[in-house]
Amino acid sequence: MRPAQTNQFDYVKIGLASPERIRQWGERTLPNGQVVGEVTKPETINYRTLKPEMDGLFCERIFGPAKDWECHCGKYKRVRHRGIVCERCGVEVTESRVRRHRMGYIKLAAPVAHVWYLKGIPSYISILLDMPLRDVEQIVYFNSYVVLSPGNAETLTYKQLLSEDQWLEIEDQIYSEDSVLQGVEVGIGAEALLRLLADINLEQEAESLREEIGNAKGQKRAKLIKRLRVIDNFIATGSKPEWMVMAVIPVIPPDLRPMVQLDGGRFATSDLNDLYRRVINRNNRLARLQEILAPEIIVRNEKRMLQEAVDALIDNGRRGRTVVGANNRPLKSLSDIIEGKQGRFRQNLLGKRVDYSGRSVIVVGPKLKIHQCGLPREMAIELFQPFVINRLIRSGMVNNIKAAKKLISRNDPSVWDVLEEVIEGHPVMLNRAPTLHRLGIQSFEPILVEGRAIQLHPLVCPAFNADFDGDQMAVHVPLSLESQAEARLLMLASNNILSPATGKPIITPSQDMVLGAYYLTAENPGATKGAGNYFSSLEDVIMAFQQDQIDLHAYIYVRFDGEIESDQPDTEPVKVTENEDGTRTLLYKFRRVRQDAKGNVLSQYIYTTPGRVIYNNAIQEALAS
């Protein structure tokens, strides 16, 4: 086996490709000296043999074999012939997966403008040429001629547009016997555009623009700066303006635009194949018309159709009529495949499905601490399975991975104990789409729960913008020690109390919490059950309430030796009683204090309700933990 080659790279740069580079992408030289790579036929596969047609859109000579280690004609079959190029069919004997990256190219019989740079916003071609977009379109789509060189004609200027009649008039003057016009050049179509772009001297243009900007003001200055910025970018990247007009177009690998046979014998194919077929057909027809020296008007019409076919291939619907397939559905062009939510970048590169992740519906978990989440058992055993298997083997409970998996599938009780050990101190990350700010993904300590729903603390809902009407959340397990440390130190819910946008607290009590706190501490004079009773501790009060001995809002006395704060002054006793044993009882507004003869406090009972005791007890427990 050959060692796998790993190419180290820092970034991917997207820019203009020169015709030479496009040709390099697809061109290969066979051992017999034959150069392959150009796609010349619109055919895809032979419907009798179901094999790709040579020089077609699925050609095995250009893109590689359709079957592993097998050439087109069948002379070489087996891995032992690796690297051999069949002398009969010219197909290299290699793996079929090369068809995922080998490209081809189509050499165009006439240059065509790239629709992104022509019809994009802003139109870079029109900015560079300093012409209105409407005029540039007139040239590209063969509606108007453009003066490439005025020569000695006084009535003509460089880049001036001419109608058909005006050009015929000038042509008559040029070819008349007593003609004085010399050096007049007029063009039409993308060829004229190519000439205009090639004539631009970027450095010289940038220099003169900088001088003009110094004197210009207002709208004109803004326009000049816009043009200078484009020119500077061309200089910085080393791209040439004429590369925006294509003489060669790349053909993407066949496995990225597949053709598959359906059950009924029919074929389903990617829309790109239809768009490429249109381009090849029109290109071949144009080449044939040029060969037989067809009338100019016919050739020009074919060039316009080729331009439209390439436009549809690159960005269908950007200009002119949208090309539709069967059942009037617009065909998906290269731009449609790249852009949008379902495009290659967002769907396949940024939005990959990842291992060690799961998703489920969320339900409220009011008994959880803010840094905890309830993770269903069956989800946890799946997510943490490698860790559990490792722990089972290390502890000697099983000898190999297969035995460990069998133990897990049998739901052996020992597995749950191991799982508890594994998840202790191992944070998980919860994410709710759409992740609009950094608090859309936070980490929690998992607590194993029954059922199939993830339990979420109600206080973190505003950060996730979550509610419990069927929302789903994704769980991700950080694997490396570094990621676990980051999850614990930076992403733990208890560390994300303030909103990154406003700096105000995002974890604030609301709804049930506020209502519950209000109800516990509210006054209700009608609550009389157990009113006036004395209790020796806060725990006794809670126990009496749980046994339904007292009402939640009944006023009672409970012994409490700590300090008491009140929003109302309570320093002067309302009533003082001298007891027979020499002690005194001081009755304040909210407490009852018993003192000895020296004034030392013997006991203190506070006047409160069971609801307030429960509320106070909950806060004390939270602070203590």
UniProtKB/Swiss-Prot annotation:
User: What organism is the protein native to?
Assistant: Nostoc punctiforme (strain ATCC 29133 / PCC 73102)
**UniProt gene name:** rpoC1
GO terms for MF = DNA binding; DNA-directed RNA polymerase activity; magnesium ion binding; zinc ion binding
Q: What is its EC number?
A: 2.7.7.6
**Which superkingdom heads the taxonomic lineage of this protein's source?**
Bacteria
* Gene Ontology cellular component list: DNA-directed RNA polymerase complex
Cofactor(s) required for function per UniProt: Mg(2+); Zn(2+)
User: This protein is called what?
Assistant: DNA-directed RNA polymerase subunit gamma
| Family, similarity comment | Belongs to the RNA polymerase beta' chain family. RpoC1 subfamily.
One Gene Ontology term from the biological process aspect of the record? DNA-templated transcription
